[in-house]
């Protein structure tokens, strides 16, 4: 089982924590990570694209000229696709791009993402994370104490409002609860800062 240092908010080592091998110690599956990221990004698409077809554009109800005798090509409507201002053929329509991978694959993906952070030594485990009041300066100080100077994902056991409000104005820092942890967030941030209670909660669900 991988062991990592346990820190307090002042950046001091206060012990060690043993992480569950089944969650934080597996060989990361790159293909599953890829599939999970594609799924998440697809779900983020708005899908509100739309063009009008020949039935929806304005006008074109009358035949522009008679069928025969003019010497010109036959036409049925000035809103046919070949006309300027005509309707689009097989154009985009509003749709949802979201889909779901099997539950086992999704779980393997999040375990692979967490294990990759342990392998790269990009995980910081805190004994606890609490603030008396929302204060961005205090959160910056805590991150500096932990030598976290890059994009960081902070994971708490439950969404702490003071922690959330203190971190939301710091560029590159995001706060999520343990039950909201996902592959895209873990991979998109350089450092994973997670509380001991959140580790236990994640292991309880994924182990």
From Swiss-Prot:
GO biological process: translation
Keywords for the protein's UniProt record, in alphabetical order: Ribonucleoprotein, Ribosomal protein, RNA-binding, rRNA-binding
GO cellular component, one term: ribonucleoprotein complex
Coiled coil: none
Pfam families cross-referenced by the UniProt entry: Ribosomal_L4
Keyword Cell membrane belongs to the record: no
Top-level taxon of origin: Bacteria
Residue ranges, annotated region (Disordered): 44-78
GO MF term set: rRNA binding; structural constituent of ribosome
The family this protein is said to belong to: Belongs to the universal ribosomal protein uL4 family.
Function comment: One of the primary rRNA binding proteins, this protein initially binds near the 5'-end of the 23S rRNA. It is important during the early stages of 50S assembly. It makes multiple contacts with different domains of the 23S rRNA in the assembled 50S subunit and ribosome.
Subunit annotation: Part of the 50S ribosomal subunit.
Designated name of the protein: Large ribosomal subunit protein uL4
